C-alpha cells in the first residue's frame, strides 16, 4: 500500500470497553506527522461524578509500522480524569486500529477505532484487482 494511504490523519470513530462489558463511544481527530501522532478526542461522560456531559482530551503518540501508541490526557482538572495509554495495531488498509487501553494500576480494557476507506484508495484497489 502507498505511504499516503498509510497516513492516519483524519477523523476516526472509536469505542472503548471496560472489563465489566460497559463501553463508551468517542470521536478522535488524528494528525499523522510521519512517526508522530497528535490530535484530540471527545466522548460522552457515561459515569457518575463527571466534570461535564462531554469530555475532551488531547492525544500524543507515535506509529512505527502497524504499531500505534498514544496517550490521551483529559482536559478536566480533576486528577481522576488523567492520562490513558493506548497500544494498538493498524490493519493493512489503515482503516482500523485495535488494541488495549490502560490507566496505570486502575483500569484497562479493549478499544477499536475505524475510519472509512479513502475514495481515491478504493479506486486504486479496484484498478489493482483488474491487473
Where are these regions (language model features)?
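Central antiparallel beta-sheet cores of small beta-barrel/beta-sandwich binding domains
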Residues: 2-131
Amino acid at each position: 500500500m502507498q505511504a499516503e494511504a498509510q497516513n492516519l490523519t483524519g477523523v476516526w470513530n472509536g469505542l472503548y470497553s471496560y472489563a465489566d462489558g460497559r463501553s463508551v463511544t468517542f470521536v478522535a481527530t488524528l494528525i499523522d506527522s510521519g512517526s508522530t501522532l497528535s490530535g484530540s478526542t471527545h466522548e460522552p461522560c457515561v459515569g457518575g461524578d463527571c466534570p461535564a456531559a462531554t469530555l475532551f482530551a488531547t492525544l500524543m503518540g507515535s506509529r512505527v509500522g502497524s504499531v500505534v501508541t498514544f496517550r490521551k490526557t483529559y482536559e478536566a482538572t480533576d486528577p481522576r480524569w488523567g492520562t490513558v495509554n493506548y497500544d494498538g495495531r493498524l490493519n493493512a488498509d489503515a482503516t482500523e486500529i485495535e488494541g488495549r487501553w490502560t490507566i496505570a494500576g486502575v483500569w484497562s480494557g479493549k478499544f477499536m477505532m475505524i475510519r472509512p476507506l479513502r475514495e481515491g484508495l478504493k479506486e486504486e484497489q479496484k484498478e489493482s484487482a483488474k491487473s
